[in-house]
Design a protein with these regions (language model features):
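Acidic/histidine-rich catalytic neighborhood of metal-dependent amide-processing enzymes
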Residues: 124-127, 131-213
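Acidic-enriched catalytic cores of C-N bond-cleaving enzymes acting on peptides and small amides
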Residues: 6-8, 180-183, 188, 196-209, ...
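Active-site-proximal beta-strand/loop segments in catalytic clefts of secreted hydrolases
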Residues: 32, 82-83, 96-98, 162-164, ...
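Residue-level detector of conserved catalytic or cofactor/ligand-binding positions
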Residues: 316-331
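Predominant activation on well-ordered alpha-helical scaffold segments within soluble catalytic domains
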Residues: 29, 138-141, 145, 174-177, ...
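A generic structural motif
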Residues: 38, 131, 230-236
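Acidic/His- and Gly-rich active-site-bordering loop/insert found
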Residues: 1-130, 137, 147-154
Length: 331
C-alpha cells in the first residue's frame, strides 16, 4: 500500500499573524479592474488604464513610496528602487509585467466572472491577470510593504521592475535594462515570471509528491515568416501548383526536421533533486544515475506532453494568411 503524503502548505502562516490577507486580496482585485491590455499595435492600447494602475500602486503602498523611488521608464514600464544599506552588495531585481492579453471576442460569456471584474468569490480572485501575472506584481509589492511597515530595512538594494508590453514586444523590459545599464548597475540575481503552481509531480514520475517548479532558465525564441510567390490566376487553372501548396510543403519539411534532444543542467538538477521521490518506472531506475542516463531520461521527457519542451525546441505554426477570394490563386 502506498501511503499518500500530505503537505501542510499553510504551516508558516502563523509567522505573519498580522498579515492583512483581505486587504491584499482587495488590492489585487482593484488591479484586475484596470484593463491594462497591450496590443502589438500600440495605437490601440489604452494607456489611461496603465495610469490608473500606477496611481493604485502609489496609493496602496505608502511605505514603499516613502523609502523608494517610482519611475516610469519608456512608455509605461515601472521601475521602483528600494535602496539598500550596504553599498558593497550587488542589487537584486524582481520582475513581472502589468499588461494582459485581450479577451477573445465572442468568448466573454464563457467566463465564470467577467474578465475584468476582479470579483472575490468562492475563495478566489477572478479575472484576467490573476495568474498572468498581476498576482506576482502585487505579491512582490505586498511583501516589500509588509517588511518596511514592520521596521525592516533592505541590506541589498531591490529593484521592482514591471514591464508594460511583455505580451507583445517587450520594449518596456528593454527600456528598463538599458536604464540600469546606463547607471552601471550589476545585479546579484533576477527573479522573473515562472511557474506558480503547486501540483503532483506526476510528469516527473513522482505522483505522490507535491512539487513547485522553480524556473532557472529562459529559452530563447525566434519568429519565422515564410513568403511564397507563384504565377497566380484563377483556381481552375493552378498551373505549376499554388503558393499555398508550396508553402505547406515547406512547413511540412520544417516540422518533420527534428531538433536536438538533450537534458540541460536545469533539468539534470531537477531530476537529481526529485530522485528520492520518483516512484514510477522507467524514471525510478534511470534517475539513480542522472548523468549516465541523461539520453534515456531525455527520451522519456520527449514522450511527455508536459516535459518535452524542456528537452528540445518546439515549433508552432500559428498563422497562414488567406486569399481574398476562393476563386483566386494568391501570387
Amino acid at each position: 500500500m502506498i501511503q499518500k503524503k500530505v503537505t501542510d502548505f499553510f504551516a508558516l502562516e502563523g509567522n505573519y499573524p498580522d498579515l492583512d490577507g483581505e486587504g491584499a486580496a482587495a488590492r489585487l482585485s482593484a488591479a484586475i479592474r484596470c484593463k491594462t491590455i497591450n496590443y502589438f499595435d500600440h495605437s490601440r492600447t489604452d494607456y489611461t488604464e496603465f495610469d490608473k494602475l500606477h496611481a493604485h500602486i502609489k496609493a496602496s503602498y505608502p511605505n514603499i513610496m516613502r523609502v523608494g523611488t517610482f519611475e516610469r521608464i519608456g512608455h509605461h514600464a515601472v521601475l521602483i528602487t528600494i535602496p539598500g544599506s550596504d553599498a558593497s552588495l550587488r542589487p537584486c531585481l524582481y520582475m513581472s509585467h502589468q499588461d494582459v492579453v485581450p479577451v477573445v471576442e465572442g468568448t466573454e460569456q464563457d467566463w465564470t466572472h467577467p474578465a475584468f471584474s476582479g470579483d472575490i468569490a468562492d475563495g478566489y480572485i477572478w479575472g484576467r491577470g490573476t495568474l498572468d501575472i498581476k498576482e506576482q506584481v502585487f505579491g512582490v509589492l505586498e511583501a516589500a510593504e509588509y517588511l518596511l511597515a514592520h521596521g525592516k530595512s533592505f541590506a541589498r538594494t531591490a529593484y521592482l521592475a514591471f514591464g508594460d508590453d511583455e505580451e507583445t514586444i517587450n520594449l518596456g523590459a528593454l527600456a528598463i535594462a538599458e536604464h540600469l545599464k546606463a547607471q552601471g548597475v550589476t545585479l546579484e540575481f533576477v527573479l522573473d515570471e515562472g511557474g506558480c503552481k503547486i501540483e503532483p509531480g506526476t510528469a516527473f514520475g513522482a505522483p505522490e509528491t507535491a512539487i513547485s517548479s522553480v524556473q532557472l532558465m529562459e529559452k530563447g525564441y525566434a519568429d519565422l515568416e515564410f513568403s511564397v510567390h507563384s504565377i497566380g490566376g484563377h483556381s481552375s487553372r493552378p498551373f505549376g501548383g499554388t503558393s499555398l501548396a508550396r508553402l505547406s510543403g515547406a512547413i511540412a519539411d520544417i516540422t518533420r526536421a527534428p531538433f536536438s534532444v538533450h537534458l540541460n543542467s536545469a533539468m539534470t538538477g531537477a531530476f537529481e533533486t526529485l530522485a528520492p521521490y520518483i516512484t514510477e518506472e522507467p524514471l525510478k531506475t534511470l534517475v539513480q544515475d542522472v548523468a549516465g542516463n541523461a539520453d534515456a531520461i531525455a527520451a522519456c521527457c520527449m514522450g511527455s506532453p508536459d516535459l518535452f519542451p524542456f528537452v528540445t525546441t518546439p515549433l508552432s505554426l500559428i498563422h497562414i494568411s488567406e486569399p481574398t477570394s476562393h476563386a483566386q490563386i494568391s501570387y
